[in-house]
């Protein structure tokens, strides 16, 4: 996919095959499009954001540059959302295999410690939404496991200040992110745009997508 010569990948879960029409499956698209991912639909019907291999690679590289270097990633969000897809692309760029936490039946915080242990040594990251972080903070073992990571990216919507404060008190390195499907995921980290990013914070200090 990132090589630029393969057909574009369409990221749609089997239970949402109705989205295939919105994503223009079967229609002619530019040859440099590597990934078609659904938008959130917050400003209208969901549509397909067409991302090139160059855009995906640049986004992943910029994220690693901001975070302190490539590392191993825990995939704890759905892999068909832009946040999960970004984790997969960052893993490919880093030459690592992500550890997947199955969230198809919900986010089980008791599985976090073992999943994070499987990441091994070196720099380690994950991407969560605020509700997942809040749930993890209710479990001491999960909280301690997240504190071992070099960064926990938080996006998908506003992160309440009490949750951020509790995470900081527990030693968890939270990075608030803002972005959208069209920007290949997070393009603003802690209010500062990534290098080469067209994004800008929304002025409130809150977060959007990963």
Model-derived regions: residue spans:
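Short phosphate-binding/catalytic loops that engage adenosine nucleotides
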Residues: 44, 96, 172
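Glycine-rich helix-loop-beta junction characteristic of Rossmann-like nucleotide cofactor-binding loops
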Residues: 64-68, 116-119, 143-145
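Gly/Ser/Thr-rich phosphate-binding loop
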Residues: 138-193
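Conserved beta-loop-beta connector loops within the AMP-binding
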Residues: 196-210
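Nucleotide 5′-phosphate-binding alpha/beta core
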Residues: 1-36, 45-48
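Conserved S/T- and glycine-rich ATP-binding loop of Class I adenylate-forming
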Residues: 39-42, 73, 88, 126, ...
């Amino acid at each position: 996919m990132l090589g630029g010569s393969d057909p574009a990948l369409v990221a749609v879960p089997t239970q949402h095959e109705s989205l295939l029409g919105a994503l223009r499956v079967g229609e002619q698209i530019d040859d440099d499009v590597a990934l078609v991912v659904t938008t959130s639909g917050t400003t209208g019907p969901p549509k397909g954001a067409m991302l090139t291999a160059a855009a995906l690679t640049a986004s992943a590289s910029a994220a690693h540059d901001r975070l302190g270097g490539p590392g191993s990633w825990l995939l704890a969000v759905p892999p068909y959302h832009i946040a999960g897809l970004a984790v997969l692309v960052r893993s490919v760029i880093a030459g690592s295999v992500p550890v997947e936490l199955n969230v198809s039946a919900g986010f089980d915080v008791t599985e976090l410690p073992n999943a994070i242990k499987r990441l091994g040594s070196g720099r380690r990251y994950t991407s969560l939404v605020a509700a997942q972080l809040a749930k993890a903070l209710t479990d001491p073992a999960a909280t301690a496991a997240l504190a071992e990571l070099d960064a926990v990216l938080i996006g998908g919507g506003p992160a309440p200040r009490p949750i951020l404060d509790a995470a900081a008190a527990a030693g968890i390195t939270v990075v608030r992110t803002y972005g959208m499907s069209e920007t290949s995921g997070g393009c603003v980290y802690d209010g500062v745009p990534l290098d080469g990013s067209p994004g800008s914070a929304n002025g409130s200090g809150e977060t959007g997508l990963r």
